Amino acid sequence: MMPAFVLDTSAVLTILNREEGLDAVLTLLERAKDDQDVLYLPYMALMELEYLLLRRVSPEETLAILALVRAWPVHVQESTEEWRHQAAMIKSQTPLSVADAWIASLALLHHAELVHKDPEYEHVPDLPMAKLPYKV
């Protein structure tokens, strides 16, 4: 079974903003392109990315960037009943935002490491994580 990873919005932004941790995320993308790893991108991370982009750039630029991200070697994961239930369980037991509960729950469902920069995920017990340098 190939190693699996879920990209949090912060991991995507690490690439787009050329932040610390860039090399680690680029390595994961390269490995996924070579079928060495499986990368998942939750629909909720795409939604977060879209609203953040819309605050900074035009709608046309936003759509272009989203198309670029969707072209990465990632599996964009849409909602399922099982995923919704897992997210609700996490949200009911932790202080995570709704979006972060969705994203964390996908990692648990796929037995994947969550690639992120968000210390809030520390509240989720047994969540496998590939932590990027936290923002200060």
Question: What are the functions of these language-model segments?
Answer:
Residues 7-8, 41-42, 95-97, 118, ...:
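Histidine- and aromatic-rich ligand-binding microenvironments
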Residues 12-13, 46, 121-122:
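A generic structural signal for short hydrophobic patches within well-formed alpha-helices
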Residues 75-115:
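Active-site neighborhoods of divalent-metal-dependent phosphate/nucleic-acid chemistry enzymes
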Residues 1-41, 54-67, 136:
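Short, well-structured N-terminal submotif of metal-dependent ribonuclease cores
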Residues 33, 70, 108:
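Anion (oxyanion) recognition and catalysis
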Residues 52-55, 73:
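Helix-loop "lid/cap" segments that line or gate small-molecule binding pockets
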Residues 2-4, 104-136:
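Acidic, PIN/NYN-like endoribonuclease modules and their adjacent C-terminal/linker elements
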